[in-house]
Amino acid sequence: MLFRSLVDFWAEWCGPCRAVGPILEEIAAENADKITVLKLNTDEEPSIAMKYGIASIPTMNVDVNGQIAKTIIGARPKPALLKELEAFL
């Protein structure tokens, strides 16, 4: 069985992060049986962001069974995010 998660690296002051947040919440609700969406505030957890090499936000890492399978950098509208995530949903 595959375990899929999407980790959204974000910060409160980041406008694009705040724009993509509700979109990710919708995707999470619509695909709850396929992927888990987690949020990590880079201001509150800088060491974790550094560990994953996060240089700009928003950055979304798709993890499949403990391995990063895809990285998406920057805000996207919902249709574009769904297209990037289609292999995981």
What annotation goes with each model-predicted range?
Residues 9, 20-28, 32-47, 54:
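Thiol-based oxidoreductase modules, predominantly thioredoxin-like and allied folds used
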Residues 11-12, 69:
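Conserved short-loop catalytic and cofactor-binding motifs
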Residues 14-17:
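Hydrophobic heptad-repeat coiled-coil signature
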Residues 56, 62-89:
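Non-catalytic, surface beta->alpha helical segment in thiol-disulfide oxidoreductase systems
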Residues 1-2:
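Short, small-residue-biased leader/transition segments that mark boundaries at the very start
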Residues 38, 43, 48, 61, ...:
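Short, internal strand/loop/helix patches
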Residues 8-10, 62:
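Structural cue for short, hydrophobic secondary-structure segments
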